[in-house]
Amino acid sequence: GFLGSLLKTGLKVGSNLL
């Protein structure tokens, strides 16, 4: 769903910032 992909994108960006 939309929220699932949004969460995945958030984790991806978050790990990139770290």
Curated annotation (Swiss-Prot):
Annotated organism of origin: Xenopus tropicalis
Biological processes, Gene Ontology terms: defense response to fungus; defense response to Gram-negative bacterium; defense response to Gram-positive bacterium; hemolysis in another organism
Protein name listed in UniProt: Antimicrobial peptide 6
Compartments it resides in: Secreted
Primary subcellular site in the record, as a coarse category: secreted
Modified residues (Leucine amide): 18
Gene Ontology cellular component terms for the protein in this record: extracellular region
Domain of life: Eukaryota
Keywords on record: Amidation, Amphibian defense peptide, Antibiotic, Antimicrobial, Cytolysis, Fungicide, Hemolysis, Secreted
Chain's role: Has antimicrobial activity against Gram-positive bacterium S.aureus and Gram-negative bacterium E.coli and strong activity against yeast C.albicans. Enhances the antibacterial activity of XT3. Has strong hemolytic activity against human red blood cells.
Tissue: Expressed by the skin glands.
